[in-house]
C-alpha cells in the first residue's frame, strides 16, 4: 500500500495533538481541530472539540457542510429559521448543509462540545452572515 496524507495507508494513524484555531464570534472560544483541513489534511470530514465561554456567540451561517454537534458539558443554543433549540449535555443536534444556523452559549459556565463537519469545515464554505456579531 502507498503513503497517504498521514502516513502508511495500511496502518492506523495516531494524531497526538490538535491544532488550536482562531474562532469567529464574540468572547473568544477555543477550537481544537483533531481532524480537518488544518491539522490532518482531511477534506471530507473535520472533528473539533470546542470550549465556549458564557456569553459567546458567532455570526449566523448557511454552510455547505452538514454539522453534527454533541454537547459534552453545558448548553449550546442553536438558532435556526424555524426557531431555537437548546442542546444540553449528552444531546446531539444535526444541522444539514444549506440550513441557516447560529450558535451561542448563553448560560453560566459556557459549554464543551464536539463538532463533526461533512465535508470538512472551511472558511470558504461556511458562508457567515455579514451583519451579525
Describe each model-derived feature in a short phrase.
Residues 58-60, 78-79, 95, 101-108, ...:
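Short beta-strand His + acidic residue motifs that chelate non-heme Fe in jelly-roll/DSBH
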Residues 1-44, 59, 125-133:
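A short, N-terminal "cap"/entry segment at the start of jelly-roll beta-barrel domains
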Residues 49-53, 62-78, 116:
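Short, conserved beta-strand element in jelly-roll/cupin
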Residues 36-37, 57-63, 85, 104-106, ...:
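Short histidine-centered beta-strand/loop micro-motifs
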Residues 82-98:
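Short acidic-glycine-tyrosine-enriched beta hairpin
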Residues 47-50, 94, 108-125:
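A short hydrophobic beta-strand segment most commonly corresponding to one strand
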Residues 40-43, 52-56, 73-76, 84, ...:
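Short, charged/polar surface micro-motifs in flexible loops or helix N-caps
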